């Protein structure tokens, strides 16, 4: 059972001017009486226009940043691809140079070996060789045909070398490629001028198209130039391969000729040995010896021509290798210069295009389109409708606030009454508790006294009974006993009536069995 007082209501009592809504107390309602509806509409319109302008500016900035990022990523990817392509080409060119250098070294070694063999063959004695005239003439014809072939091949190689030198000296291909690039640059500049003179909304589209056209044309010009140079390099490589094949053929023919000469020398040595064994000599033999001497001199002359042809072939090979190296160096230099020029021009044009795009975006952000105006008008209408609905809500809220203020005034009066009733109730409750305690004490005293009285009565009865048994008659004793029994019953009824407590409400007079239920009833009845 809780006996706490209701003074908490007095302690937590609020003033009628404090917060009456559900929101936090520090957020006070705006005093809308100071603003007119026209001013509110103007403020709402200004806020809406500023919000829309900020959103458009953010969108334009995001789009511009995305476009720049995409362009930069594409440009970096293109640069990476070009670098990889040039690295692959340089590696292939280096591999080709290494292979050609190995082939040249092998050819030089073979030529040196052939020179040594030819010198050894020229040092061998051929004066004592005696061969028949028919075989000598056949060998002579074969050697002459080989010399003619070698001279023709030499002339072809010299023509190839002269053509290569002319190609190296002439810069037609590079000039053509530069002309193509300059044409593309002129077209790009014209497109940029058109973009600058074009109206505002069409500038972004024209700039993107012009940039794409210029990039495609510059890429096509660079590709055409590279394809042209690759064709020239492939033609030179084919010429080199043909020259190498011709050199191999000449080497094979020289080997065959040397083998035949060695066979003839062996035959001549064998016959000379046979003729020394036999004695006698005739005029025919003298003529044959003279013919053999002439054949030997012709063979020596042919050997000298072959060696000179070998030297000329070596010189032609060296010139070809030098020409190829010069051409490759010039090609690499031209590629590097062209790439540097195109890269620098593309960077300049990219920066100029970015500047123009920034200017266009600024101008477009300053301008407002018709669609934007329509959207703003629609939003203004919606805002006016929302303001009207909010104004109605505000009026309703004001009415409810006035009602709540009136209710608060009545609540203060009711609270004061409640405090009075509570104080009275607490005082009555304390008094009743004291009375109840006194009643309980008196009941205890009564019980003790009744017990003592019962004990005295029992003692008196016993003494009376003893006295009657001693002195009185039975009749008088029976009457006295009936009187005493009746008196004892009355005393018991009076005791029971005194022991039952009475719990009744002071306001309505309702009788209750317990003090707790009486307190609850009193609270409900009074409040």
From Swiss-Prot:
Residues 1-32, 101-143, 186-214, 262-292 are annotated as: Disordered. A zinc finger (CCHC NOA-type) spans 497-527. It is found in: Cytoplasm, Perinuclear region; Golgi apparatus; Golgi apparatus, trans-Golgi network; Cytoplasmic vesicle, Autophagosome. The keyword Coiled coil applies. Residues 201-210 have a biased composition (Polar residues). It comes from the Eukaryota. Residues 38-170, 239-458 form a coiled coil. Keywords: Autophagy, Coiled coil, Cytoplasm, Cytoplasmic vesicle, Endosome, Golgi apparatus, Metal-binding, Phosphoprotein, Zinc, Zinc-finger. Residues 362-470 are annotated as: Interaction with MYO6. GO terms for cellular component: autophagosome; Golgi apparatus; nucleus; perinuclear region of cytoplasm; recycling endosome; trans-Golgi network. GO terms for molecular function: K63-linked polyubiquitin modification-dependent protein binding; zinc ion binding. GO terms for biological process: autophagy; cellular response to unfolded protein; Golgi ribbon formation; protein localization to Golgi apparatus; regulation of canonical NF-kappaB signal transduction. A motif (LIR) lies at residues 176-181. The modification Phosphoserine is found at residues 177, 198, 476. Residues 186-197, 262-274, 281-292 have a biased composition (Basic and acidic residues). InterPro entries: CC2-LZ_dom (IPR032419), NEMO_N (IPR021063), NEMO_ZF (IPR034735), Optineurin/NFkB_EssMod (IPR051301). CDD domains: UBAN (cd09803). Residues 361-527 are annotated as: Interaction with HD. Self-associates. Interacts with HD. Interacts with GTF3A. Interacts with MYO6. Interacts (via UBAN) with ubiquitinated TFRC. Interacts with GTP-bound Rab8 (RAB8A and/or RAB8B). Interacts with TBC1D17. Interacts with TBK1. Interacts with TRAF3. Binds to linear ubiquitin chains. Interacts with LC3 family members MAP1LC3A, MAP1LC3B, GABARAP, GABARAPL1 and GABARAPL2; OPTN phosphorylation increases the association (at least with MAP1LC3B). Interacts with RAB12; the interaction may be indirect. Plays an important role in the maintenance of the Golgi complex, in membrane trafficking, in exocytosis, through its interaction with myosin VI and Rab8. Links myosin VI to the Golgi complex and plays an important role in Golgi ribbon formation. Negatively regulates the induction of IFNB in response to RNA virus infection. Plays a neuroprotective role in the eye and optic nerve. Probably part of the TNF-alpha signaling pathway that can shift the equilibrium toward induction of cell death. Ubiquitin-binding motif (UBAN) is essential for its inhibitory function, subcellular localization and interaction with TBK1. The LIR (LC3-interacting region) motif mediates the interaction with ATG8 family proteins. This is Optineurin. It comes from Pongo abelii (Sumatran orangutan). The gene is OPTN.
């Amino acid at each position: 059972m809780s006996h706490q007082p209701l003074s908490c209501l007095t302690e937590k009592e609020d003033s009628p001017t404090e917060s009456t809504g559900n929101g936090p107390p520090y957020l006070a309602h705006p005093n809308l009486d100071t603003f007119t509806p026209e001013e509110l509409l103007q403020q709402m319109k200004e806020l809406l226009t500023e919000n829309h302008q900020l959103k458009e500016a953010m969108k334009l900035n995001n789009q511009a940043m995305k476009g720049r990022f995409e362009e930069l990523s594409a440009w970096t990817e293109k640069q990476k691809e070009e670098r990889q392509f040039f690295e692959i080409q340089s590696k292939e060119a280096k591999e080709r140079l290494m292979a050609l250098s190995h082939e040249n070294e092998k050819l030089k070694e073979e030529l040196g070996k052939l020179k040594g063999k030819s010198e050894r063959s020229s040092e061998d004695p051929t004066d004592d060789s005696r061969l028949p005239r028919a075989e000598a003439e056949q060998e002579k014809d074969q050697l002459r045909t080989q010399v003619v072939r070698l001279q023709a091949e030499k002339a072809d190689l010299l023509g190839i070398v002269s053509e290569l030198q002319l190609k190296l000296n002439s810069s037609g291909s590079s000039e053509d490629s530069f002309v193509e690039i300059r044409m593309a640059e002129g077209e790009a500049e014209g497109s940029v001028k058109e973009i600058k003179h074009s109206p505002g909304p069409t500038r972004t589209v024209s700039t993107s198209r012009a940039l794409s056209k210029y990039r495609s044309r510059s890429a096509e010009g660079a590709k055409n130039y590279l394809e042209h140079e690759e064709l020239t390099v492939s033609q030179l490589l084919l010429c080199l391969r043909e020259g190498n094949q011709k050199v191999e053929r000449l080497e094979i023919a020289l080997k065959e000729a040397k083998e035949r000469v060695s066979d003839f020398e062996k035959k001549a040595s064998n016959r000379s040995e046979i003729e020394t064994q036999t004695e006698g000599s005739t005029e025919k033999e003298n003529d044959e010896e003279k013919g053999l001497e002439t054949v030997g001199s012709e063979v020596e002359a042919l050997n000298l021509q072959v060696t000179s042809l070998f030297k000329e072939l070596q010189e032609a090979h060296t010139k070809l290798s030098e020409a190829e190296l010069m051409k490759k160096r010039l090609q690499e230099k031209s590629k590097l210069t062209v790439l540097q020029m195109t890269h620098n021009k593309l960077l300049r044009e990219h920066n100029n295009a970015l500047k123009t795009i920034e200017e266009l975006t600024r101008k477009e952000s300053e301008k407002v389109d018709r669609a934007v105006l329509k959207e703003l008008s629609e939003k203004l209408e919606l805002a006016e409708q929302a303001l009207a609905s909010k104004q109605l809500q505000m009026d309703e809220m004001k009415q409810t606030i006035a009602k709540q203020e009136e209710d608060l005034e009545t609540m203060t009066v009711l609270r004061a009454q409640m405090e009075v009733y509570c104080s009275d109730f607490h005082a009555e409750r304390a008094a009743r508790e004291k009375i109840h305690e006194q009643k309980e004490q008196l009941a205890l005293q009564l019980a003790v006294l009744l017990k003592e009285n019962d004990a005295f009565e029992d003692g008196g009865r016993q003494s009376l009974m003893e006295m009657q048994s001693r002195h009185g008659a039975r009749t008088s004793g029976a009457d006295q006993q009936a009187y005493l029994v009746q008196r004892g019953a009355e005393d018991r009824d009076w005791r029971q009536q005194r022991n039952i407590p009475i719990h009744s409400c002071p306001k309505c007079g309702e009788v209750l069995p317990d003090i707790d239920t009486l307190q609850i009833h009193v609270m409900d009845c009074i409040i």
